Amino acid sequence: MKVLIIPDVHLKPFMFKQAAELMERGIAKRAVCLMDIPDDWDKQFDISLYEETYDAAISFAKKYPDTAWCYGNHDLSYVWHVPETGYSTMAAYTVQKKLLDLKEVLPESNPIKYAHRIDNVLFSHAGISKDFVDLYVPKIKHDDVDTVLNYINNLGKMKMWYDGSPIWLRPQYTDVKMYKSQQFLQVVGHTPMETITKKKNVISCDVFSTYRDGKPIGTEEFLLLDTITWDYSMVNYGNY
């Protein structure tokens, strides 16, 4: 299946508009969003931008209800009341309400999760390590991927809010062993990259994030992935 991945958003409503137009052109059958919808440099008081971004996400969710949504650390900081870099106390109510609005438009069978699986590809905000699975999933269950994801998706703040979890891991800069690294590809965001990059069985695609002055860190391209063959390409909206 061809899948279009929307990486970390961070108050960029245009990402959903561009992704919607690409989907309309038939570029992919399904979309995945790695979230981190709120927060960006020095935007804590721009409540209208928070509203606009969530409204764009909700509009996209209505149009493409089978989109897989993966919680990011910035999303959960408002759910769990744990201030994060860029956290806006002014926008907290707006984020909480709009996140509920987003949840309400999603099908009951397709809620926001920490991790989703499509064919032999695992999608999460930051990545699922073998150590994390060893820590929180009974060993006898490790070969049943859907059961492993079910265990993970039912964990709470105490187990998820730390550096090794699927909302915080940074496999780009360490030699951490990933879960089922020979059998499954993982697609992650979280760590800003200059370009969409594959390292072993992990594709990192957070290429829309910016420096504090607003200059893009990455190429601002979407990842287009075949979940069967693992073939992938980078899609620049302006050139497609």
Which ranges hold each PLM region?
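Flexible, charged surface loops at secondary-structure boundaries
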Residues: 24-27, 62-63, 117, 177-182, ...
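Active-site-proximal loop/helix segment associated with metal-binding centers of metalloenzymes
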Residues: 90-101, 107, 112-180
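Beta-strand-turn-beta hairpins that frame and shape the catalytic cleft
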Residues: 1-4, 116-123, 198-201
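Conserved beta-sheet core of the metallophosphoesterase superfamily
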Residues: 172-235
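Short hydrophobic beta-strand that contains or immediately precedes a catalytic carboxylate
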Residues: 5-6, 71, 123-124, 188, ...
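Active-site environment of divalent metal-dependent phosphoester hydrolases
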Residues: 10-15, 39-42, 74-81, 129-131, ...
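Core catalytic region of metal-dependent phosphoesterases/phosphodiesterases
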Residues: 6, 11-99
